[in-house]
Amino acid sequence: MMTLKEFGENLKKLNLAYAELKKKYGKPEVGKTIEVAGITWRVLDKLEKGYLVISDEFYGDSREFDDNSNNWDSSDLRNELNTDLRKKIEDSVGEGALLKFTRDLLSMDGQTEYGTCEDYVSILTVDEYRKYRKYLPNMEKWWWLITPHTTPCNNNSSWVQVVSPSGRIDYDDCCGSDGVRPICIFSSSIFESCEEDDD
């Protein structure tokens, strides 16, 4: 059985650990950055159940979207982000830290052939890029968006929208090599203590 002194020492250690975690994660503010799972994330929006964030830097090396299709739902990049990166984040802050969200795969020319899918980790659509552009400074290289240029019903399944270093939207072949800026929704629960302390 633990003595009162041992309990007090353990409580002191827990309080110190809690203070460090609180300092590390801080209270998310739209437009500001937070660090989670060793990655710096820029907060794009405060949603009903969490915070929409984007990696402030490129995640890993430039890579292809997929080797033969501009359909995000079946892409190699989607699989990588929703397995490897999801695991890294959940190993750091626990299961339930990421919220699943719906992705609209509407093409630039209005084709709905690809429909929607649900992700834990994704990349921005063209519409989201435009909506949050004020929080997204220009980067040093091209990076992928989720939006296809068109779909097979218009005889093309390879072009995908990208963002240029100057912030202009263009397109590239799905097997091109571009940067990746993952997005996800962090559950408010991982920041609750910070939010409560600030109220």
What kind of region is each of these model predictions?
Residues 2-199:
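Collagenous Gly-X-Y triple-helix signature in extracellular proteins
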